[in-house]
């Protein structure tokens, strides 16, 4: 059975940022290999989430209905990672990390992770150091 990789989207998400990972998961990490994962979308509610590019995405799960059993959580970057909406993601990330889940964050989502101290004790990449300091501070 395929394991789900949850792509967490906020409104005004960066639609291009999760694309290559989702393609690899959905078709086999190595071309022709067994497909072990399936990408699924999680958003604050089950309402349509709109991307920066204007795409409208219907989530598979809301924050309240997302499964407890999944392979990984991917926070896709976008324009709302410094918003009150993003604060709803903190307990989701805390729970994922406590349960040993893989958690990835792209672009602005990595600054969100830094701002909440999730990157303090792990090696990570992000945008430029000045950018990370601006949005994540010294958390």
For each feature predicted by the language model, list its residue ranges.
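Extended, subdomain-level signal for the structured scaffold at the beginning of enzyme domains
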Residues: 1-99, 112-121, 132-139
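Short, hydrophobic beta-strand segments that form beta-sheet elements in well-ordered domains
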Residues: 40-43, 103-107, 123-127
């Amino acid at each position: 059975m395929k394991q789900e990789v949850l792509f967490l989207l906020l409104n005004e998400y960066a639609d291009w940022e999760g694309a290559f990972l989702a393609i690899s998961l959905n078709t086999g990490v190595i071309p022709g290999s067994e497909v072990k994962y399936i990408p699924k979308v999680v958003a604050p509610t089950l309402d349509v989430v709109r991307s920066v590019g204007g795409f409208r995405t219907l989530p598979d799960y809301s924050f309240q209905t997302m499964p407890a059993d999944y392979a990984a959580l991917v926070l896709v970057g976008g324009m709302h990672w410094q918003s009150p909406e993003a604060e709803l993601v903190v307990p989701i990330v805390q729970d994922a990390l406590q349960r040993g889940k893989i958690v990835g964050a792209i672009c602005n989502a990595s600054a969100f992770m830094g701002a909440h101290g999730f990157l303090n004790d792990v090696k990570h990449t992000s945008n430029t150091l000045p950018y990370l300091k601006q949005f994540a501070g010294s958390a």
